[in-house]
Amino acid sequence: MDNITIRDIKVFVTAPRGINLVIVKVETSEPELFGYGCATFTWRHKAVVTAIEEYLCPMLKGRSVHNIEDIWQTMMGSSYWRNGPILNNAISGVDEALWDIKGKLAGMPLYSLLGGKAREGVTVYRHADGGCLEEVKECISRYIEEGYRHIRCHMGTYGGNFDGRRQQMVKPEGAPEGAYFHPKMYMDSVIRLFEQVRKDFGWELEVMHDVHERLSLADTLAFTKELEPFKLFFLEDSLAPDQVGYYKYMREQTAVPFAMGELFTNPAEWKTIIQNQWIDFIRVHLSDIGGITPAVKLAHFCDAYGVRTAWHGPNDLSPIGMCAQMHLDLNSHNFGIQEFSGFTQEEEAVFPGCPKIRDGYAYVDDTPGIGVGFDEKEAAKYPAVDMDHSWLFARLPDGTAVRP
């Protein structure tokens, strides 16, 4: 079957969780052979769909499905300017689908194509959140009962709710609406949160926290030092992508492990901090860097410098995308941990073959390819939705916009 070519590329948008997911189907010259990939950029899903349907599909029809590397390089250079999240997600959908096809042709799961297993299960972590300390503690207790040993702890989502004190902030007259937060109140509430978590749950539980790039450089360093006594597994995304050079100074002044990369889209953003070993975990979102092909290269690059993987695994990632990451987790020598947001019953109906979770480990089966299917009829029950973007509009108490 050496002459198999791309016959067509189709794109689906479905929202079984109330979050828009973009799924790519690459059909081949063999009628029963096709592959699925994740191209989910939730906040710009229409732009991703257009990029695939209007640009990538016409360009790729008739090309051999075997030449994944050449196809990836061709897609990346096809618009001259490159490495933006819209194009990268479009590329990822095709790239993952081609790897899915290659696995089906070989009769092997993706992790075998990559070199086989380095471990039998994938350690995952969950998010514990709540509007107050008691709600967060209840969430942590529930996850511990389910067997999870790594939990990311927040109170009131990103920026916190300061134990209900958010309403104490006074905005200037005429200030726009947005997700207002007070840096000092936020930092204080997180310190109190971890004091209580360690008091109630001890030191065997591995805990994390995500700053979500919302603090100034000086506040970030001070906050990190305050967190040091709580022995976090890692502190996530302390700095914005255009400020990562500051990790040099943070590394010199604290022993807190750093995870970074959720917003990265190109190698220039991660190269220096990995080579200088300023971070401990790389946290990129696979589809935002272009899929499996660049992620494998990134994992190997990190391995040479002692940096472990902790791929971004939010709820706006399809089960196909999540499973693709878990195949890399099984294969990569330098795997650290996998973020996991769970699957709803609706998602499991749309995406048959979702990985199974037992006692804090994820397991993928030996189905050839990525291993997660896509029920097009079931997906049609959950059309695209208009999503609430308000949490993206972070603002300081005086109304100043804050961007991650």
From Swiss-Prot:
Keywords: Magnesium, Metal-binding. It holds the Pfam family MR_MLE_N. InterPro entries: DgoD-like, Enolase-like_C_sf, Enolase-like_N, Enolase_C-like, Mandel_Rmase/mucon_lact_enz_CS, Mandelate_racemase_C, Mandelate_racemase_N_dom. The keyword tRNA processing does not apply. The lineage of its organism: Bacteria, Bacillati, Bacillota, Clostridia, Lachnospirales. Has no detectable activity with D-mannonate and with a panel of 70 other acid sugars (in vitro), in spite of the conservation of the residues that are expected to be important for catalytic activity and cofactor binding. May have evolved a divergent function. Belongs to the mandelate racemase/muconate lactonizing enzyme family. GalD subfamily. PROSITE patterns: MR_MLE_1 (PS00908). One of its GO terms (biological process) is amino acid catabolic process. D-arabinonate binds at residues 212, 262, 283, 312, 339. Mg(2+) binds at residues 210, 236, 262. The keyword Nucleus does not apply. This is D-galactonate dehydratase family member CLOBOL_02770.
